[in-house]
């Protein structure tokens, strides 16, 4: 039996409905799963979706919003968050096997008074999965983050021995699930030159190195050297200390669409690795390849997790 995958449409002012409509036309997607769509269905239909065989849960965003130019709005935040809540309820009740989330707008959530910084933060705090791990997957890259959406000035405060240990443990488990044959992992230092042995920074010496002593297959390197070695294919995964340390090389060097995967939840949750793209929303030119891969990856892992 095909896994049931809940697909949320994200912020209705963005490209979520468009990339979902395009993904639902993929033969591979329809063979891989039974989709359940949650969000503003009118937006989905505006991109030619009319398949009555697909079960939809409508979360209307309102006519007033649709007359405005694509931008962050309170209404968009409320609707996208409600869709996520519905999908989460279905997943935790076992009514779906996985969730794929189209992009939300964090500013819209902020305008709506929603305190979470994104999907991953919502799952961690609402359902008490503090160690749920943000991972990015493509054909040639498997990358995990220690810290995520925060000011760069605060990154070092969040890199603790406990956090580093949890990330390494979960990333090892995630790589086995994919599966990745090469178990060796690279860890990108926070500072240039790894702080030169404490000469100008101490995070590596005081925090990261002591935590990594427990892991024989994890190697700490300056981030430029780490990415260079990783792309040579000598390691199965790479851990980055902060967001852009991962996303810049990831989007530059990936040989296929990138998928975001939240590992450590009792179900599979993925998303395309891009945002709402307000600048092209409504123009019909959005690339759905990352969304398609997110659905296929979610379906694949959902089948594995059921066994």
What are these regions (language model features)?
Residues 111-133:
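Glycine/threonine-rich beta-strand-loop-alpha-helix active-site module
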Residues 135-136, 177:
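Short secondary-structure boundary/capping segments
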Residues 122-130, 150-174:
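Active-site glycine-rich loop that binds ribose-phosphate moieties when present
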Residues 138-143:
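Beta-strand-turn-beta hairpins that frame and shape the catalytic cleft
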Residues 1-119, 161-241, 245-259, 263-276, ...:
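Contiguous, glycine/small-aliphatic-enriched amphipathic segments in soluble metabolic enzymes
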